[in-house]
Amino acid sequence: MSNHTHHPKFKTLKRAWKASKYFIVGLSCLYKFNLKSLVQTALTTLAMITLTSLVITAIIYISVGNAKAKPTSKPTTQQTQQLQNHTPPPLTEHNYKSTHTSIQSTTLSQPPNIDTTSGTTYGHPTNRTQNRKIKSQSTPLATRKPPINPLGSNPPENHQDHNNSQTLPHVPCSTCEGNPACSPLCQIELERAPSSAPTITLKKAPKPKTTKKPTKTTIYHRTSPEAKLQTKKIMATPQQGILSSPEHQTNQSTTQISQHTSI
């Protein structure tokens, strides 16, 4: 509290405390003179003053504690620059080559193992394997390009050896637009793919077309027995204009002659 004695709120608290002391002395004097009503009003006002003073002190302590907890000063530009300088530089080709040469120099500087019993010297086998790994890591990955076929349309033959089996790179057919060397690779990849079996579609034989001939409709009329008799009579009597037999003609000529003589 010694550091905060000059705060204006603390000064007001001191003044209120002194005033309360004088107020208590005055109340005691009034109580001696039997002025109870004035004493009661004075006590209530005193209680209100003490409560307000306690609330003010609590607020002051809370504000002081928060001020101590929060950092008052922000990091300066020099501190931020120092932090940036401490960050490691990004890996570039020059840095990578320098680290690669340092690793090779350390591996080559190791002395060979000497066998004292047989008197022969031999190099450590792990150095060769390490050098091979480092070289494989140092070489950048080259972009795979499809091999150029000189014949163009004729795809290469599939030479499958059981001992040395080589797998060709997968080339999607969507990237083969305008590249004649890429089309045989797509065909080879489709032939070698075990999962994608060729689907056989059976074509149904077309049925022969048959043209239906129109059928003749026969109409049957029911005839009565009287109509049948009339048709028979008509068939029996010869019609006029039809050539008759020679006997019939001779009979007609004789009848005509007899008629003329009688006249």
UniProtKB/Swiss-Prot annotation:
Organism of derivation: Bovine respiratory syncytial virus (strain 127)
Source organism, top-level taxon: Viruses
GO cellular component, one term: extracellular region
Compositional bias segments (type: Polar residues): 98-129, 151-166
Matching InterPro entries: G_prot (IPR000925)
Record gene name: G
Alphabetical keyword list: Disulfide bond, Glycoprotein, Host cell membrane, Host membrane, Host-virus interaction, Membrane, Secreted, Transmembrane, Transmembrane helix, Viral attachment to host cell, Viral immunoevasion, Virion, Virus entry into host cell
Cysteine pairings via disulfide bonds: 173-186, 176-182
Family: Belongs to the pneumoviruses glycoprotein G family.
Extracellular side: 67-263
Region described as Binding to host heparan sulfate: spans on this chain: 187-198
Sites marked Cleavage: 65-66
Pfam families to which the protein is assigned, alphabetical: Glycoprotein_G (PF00802)
Protein name: Major surface glycoprotein G
Glycan attachment positions: 72, 80, 87, 92, 105, 127, 139, 163, 199, 215, 231, 251, 253
Biased composition (Low complexity): 72-86
Residues spanning the membrane: 38-66
Any Gene Ontology biological process: symbiont entry into host cell
Ranges of biased composition (kind: Basic residues): 204-215
Cytoplasmic side: 1-37
Segments of this protein annotated with the region Disordered: 69-166, 197-218, 242-263
